A protein has these predicted regions:
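Acidic/negatively charged segments and metal-coordination signatures
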Residues: 1-75, 82, 86-174
Length: 174
């Protein structure tokens, strides 16, 4: 989950209601959403750990056929990311120039006509070469998430342990 610089992130209760329905409407009567929500929570934790450690994660991308372009294959993932940004706009309201490139790597998969009020983003997208294949498209998405994390939750530099002075050498005898 992407957070802003103050560490504010949607809680599980905030985002879980959108797992079954984008608008957050309740599940139909009699439907037990528990197992699906448990899986979503588990995946969230996996992604959280990977992004926090800046490790590779495998986005769930399912190409439909060999004729499909890389952008068409990743579009459901990108659309989910965009929907999350609409629901939880803290990331998009940050004024951080370092976010433009990673957001462009994600949003370049949309039709340029769909990027309303995103002139700076559209300008950067025009300079990016589209991915040559699905592997490159997936790599760009993961890279974009890591770059976003670098801005929204920078790694804390671990304090260096202080070195203890070693044993003193005895004075030289004459």
């Amino acid at each position: 989950m992407v957070v802003d610089r103050e560490g504010i992130a949607p809680t599980a209760a905030d985002w879980q209601r959108h797992v079954l329905d984008l608008e957050g409407r309740p599940a139909p009567a009699g439907y037990d959403a528990g197992p699906l929500l448990a899986l979503a929570q588990r995946r969230h934790a996996e992604l959280q750990r990977a992004i926090d450690a800046r490790d590779w994660f495998d986005p769930w991308i399912y190409p439909n056929d060999e004729e499909e372009s890389p952008s068409e294959a990743v579009l459901p993932w990108v659309a989910g990311f965009a929907a999350a940004q609409d629901l939880f706009p803290a990331l998009m309201s940050m004024n951080a120039p370092d976010l433009v490139e990673p957001l462009a790597l994600v949003y370049l998969h949309f039709d340029p006509e769909d990027l309303e009020d995103a002139d700076a983003l559209a300008a950067v997208i025009e300079t990016i070469e589209p991915p040559a294949d699905l592997a490159e498209a997936v790599q760009d998405l993961v890279r974009a998430m890591m770059l976003i994390a670098d801005v929204t939750r920078p790694r804390r530099v671990a304090p260096q342990p202080q070195r203890r002075p070693g044993p003193r050498k005895p004075p030289r005898r004459r």
